[in-house]
Amino acid sequence: MQPTRILQGLKYRKLRLTTKDVNKGFYKGNRTGSMGTHTSYGTYKIDYTKVRTYVCPDLTGFKLTPFVSKTIRPVHDQFPGDKLGPKNPATYLARWKSENGLD
């Protein structure tokens, strides 16, 4: 039995790894690199010179705005005379029936 023509001419490592190769001990990885080292005590020490940091540019005078306005205040429902408040199952079912219509 002989290897295929591709494997005869090239080294196997130059070929792209497939899902069938992964189970045979090859680690494909996702090209992120290591952010530190493993110590002899079983812990991982982060090397902060390898950690990626992203600097946000100056946004003064930036023309795009966020999707949600910062001036809108959150609305809290009022439950007068109800001890459980929003946790009351009867209130939840009544609101669900009023909004959806069907039981």
Swiss-Prot record:
GO terms for biological process: translation. Coiled coil: none annotated. It comes from the Eukaryota. Keywords: Mitochondrion, Ribonucleoprotein, Ribosomal protein, Transit peptide. It is found in: Mitochondrion. Component of the mitochondrial ribosome (mitoribosome), a dedicated translation machinery responsible for the synthesis of mitochondrial genome-encoded proteins, including at least some of the essential transmembrane subunits of the mitochondrial respiratory chain. The mitoribosomes are attached to the mitochondrial inner membrane and translation products are cotranslationally integrated into the membrane. Belongs to the mitochondrion-specific ribosomal protein mL41 family. This is Large ribosomal subunit protein mL41. The gene is mrpl27.
